[in-house]
Regions:
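General beta-strand structural signal in soluble alpha/beta enzymes
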Residues: 94-97, 124-126, 149-153, 176-179, ...
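Conserved active-site and cofactor/substrate-binding residues in soluble primary-metabolism enzymes
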Residues: 9, 13, 17, 37, ...
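Rossmann-like NAD(P)H-binding beta-loop-alpha module
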Residues: 143-211, 218-223
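Rossmann-fold NAD(P)-binding glycine/threonine-rich loop
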Residues: 100-119, 126-166
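Substrate-binding/catalytic subdomain of NAD(P)-dependent oxidoreductase enzymes
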Residues: 191, 202-299, 304-306
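N-terminal glycine-/serine-/threonine-rich beta1-alpha1-beta2 phosphate-ribose binding loop
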Residues: 1-118
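Flexible, glycine/charged-enriched surface loops at secondary-structure junctions
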Residues: 30-37, 215-218, 239-245, 270, ...
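Catalytic, metal-anchored helix/loop core of enzyme active sites in primary metabolism
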Residues: 176-181, 186, 204, 209-216, ...
Length: 363
C-alpha cells in the first residue's frame, strides 16, 4: 500500500479537522481508499511550524486547545511558521493549503500554491482567493510539473459542486448557474423574516459559528463574488475577474422588507449567478433577489447552500448541501486528495512509496 505525506499549511478549524480525520480514522480510510495518509509538516501563524518526516504524532496536538498550541518547544518545532521553507523543502507529496482568504490579491495563499506546484508537489486548497484570482495560472503550473491542483471546497465546502459539473454533466451544455452560496447571509435573511434585526441576526450567526468576527465578506457579498467567479470560470469557461462580477449585499434589507416578501409568497435570498449571453460572454452578479416560492432555491434555509445548474437537455438541476462547517470542509480536502490519487496514480493503484533519509527526519 502506498502513502501520501502531507504538509498542512494553516492549522485552524479546517486543517485541524482534517488532522482529526487522519488521526481517528486513518486505518479505516487506508483500507477503503487503498493508500495511507501521514502528516509530516504543520505551519500556523500563531503556533509556528512543526516538521517530522517520519510522521507527526497528531493526538497530543489535537488534545490541546487551539489557542494554547505552540510548536517551539517540540522536537522539530519552531516559533516561526517558515511557510516558504516548509513548502519548498520538506519532503511532502501534497501541500494542503487552508489559510485565510484574501479577496484582494489571494496572498499569502497564492504564493503558497505557487511554491508548492513549482516544487513538484500536489496542492489541494479550500482557499477561494488563489482559485478565483489565478486558477488558470496555477493549473498551468501544475501541468508543467506533473502534479495536481484541486479546490473542491472553495465553493460549497463539502458539497461537491465542481466535480458534479465536471463528471455528471457530460454531453450537456450548461448555460448558467445560480446559487445560494453563503450560509451566513442565508441564515440572517431567515431571521429577518422572523422579525429579528440585522445586527441581532448577525450576532446570532456569530454565536452559532456561521459568521466570522468581521461578517463584512458574508453580508456584503464579497464571499459569494469569489465563488461566482470560480463557478463561471470553471463551469462556463469564462475568464472573469472580480470587477466583472456585479456585487450587492443584504445590509439594506430590513425585517419589514423580508416579512412583506413572505406575505406575497416571496423569499429574499442572496443569489450568485452567472449566465452565458447570446454573444458568448458571461453575465455574472451577486445580489439579493426576492424569489417566488416555486423557485428551486427559495426553500433553501439556514446555513444550507445550493447551486442550480441550467442545462440544455435536463433543464435545471439543483444540488444542495452544507455550505460551511469545519468537518464538512475537511471532507472536501479529503475528496481532493482522493482526486489527486485517481488522476495521477489510478493506473498503478498506488500512492508514492517513501524512503526518508535519517538526517532529515526532524528539522
Amino acid at each position: 500500500m502506498g502513502r501520501y505525506d502531507l504538509a498542512l499549511i494553516g492549522f485552524g478549524g479546517v486543517n485541524r479537522a482534517l488532522a482529526e480525520l487522519i488521526s481517528q480514522r486513518g486505518d479505516r480510510l487506508a483500507e477503503e481508499l487503498g493508500f495511507a495518509l501521514r502528516v509530516v509538516a504543520i505551519t500556523d501563524l500563531r503556533a509556528g511550524s512543526l516538521v517530522d518526516t517520519h510522521g507527526i504524532d497528531l493526538a497530543p496536538l489535537l488534545a490541546a486547545e487551539p489557542g494554547e498550541l505552540a510548536f517551539a518547544g517540540l522536537p522539530g518545532g519552531s516559533a516561526e511558521p517558515r511557510n516558504e521553507w516548509v513548502i519548498r523543502e520538506v519532503p511532502a507529496d501534497i501541500v494542503v493549503e487552508a489559510t485565510f482568504t484574501n479577496p484582494a490579491d489571494g496572498e499569502p495563499a497564492l504564493s503558497h500554491a505557487r511554491w508548492a506546484l513549482a516544487a513538484g508537489k500536489h496542492v489541494c486548497t479550500t482557499n477561494k482567493g488563489p482559485v478565483a484570482l489565478a486558477c488558470r495560472e496555477l493549473k498551468q503550473l501544475a501541468a508543467e510539473h506533473g502534479v495536481g491542483f484541486e479546490f473542491e471546497g472553495s465553493v460549497l465546502s463539502g458539497t461537491p459542486i465542481l466535480r458534479t459539473a465536471e463528471r455528471m454533466f457530460g454531453g450537456l451544455e450548461i448555460t448558467g448557474v445560480q446559487g445560494i452560496m453563503n450560509g451566513t447571509s442565508n441564515y440572517v435573511l431567515g431571521r429577518l423574516e422572523e422579525g429579528v434585526g440585522l445586527r441581532a441576526a448577525i450576532a446570532e450567526a456569530q454565536e452559532l459559528g456561521y459568521a466570522e468576527a468581521d461578517p463584512t465578506a458574508d453580508i456584503e457579498g464579497h464571499d459569494v463574488q469569489l465563488k461566482v467567479m470560480i463557478l463561471a470560470n470553471e463551469v462556463l469557461g469564462a475568464e472573469l475577474c472580480r470587477e466583472d462580477v456585479i456585487r450587492e449585499g443584504i445590509s439594506k434589507i430590513t425585517p419589514e422588507d423580508a416579512q412583506d416578501a413572505v406575505s406575497k409568497g416571496l423569499r429574499w435570498k442572496l443569489v450568485g449567478s452567472a449566465a452565458r449571453r447570446p454573444d458568448g460572454t458571461v453575465d455574472a452578479r451577486v445580489a439579493p433577489v426576492a424569489l417566488p416560492g416555486h423557485h428551486p432555491l427559495a426553500g433553501i434555509s439556514g446555513p444550507v447552500n445550493a447551486v442550480a445548474f441550467h442545462t440544455d437537455l435536463l433543464g435545471t438541476v439543483t444540488v444542495s448541501g452544507p455550505g460551511a462547517g469545519r468537518i464538512e470542509t475537511a471532507y472536501a480536502l479529503l475528496s481532493d486528495i482522493i482526486a489527486i490519487h485517481q488522476r495521477h496514480h489510478a493506473d498503478d493503484d498506488t500512492a508514492p512509496a517513501h524512503r526518508v533519509p535519517q538526517e532529515t527526519s526532524r528539522v
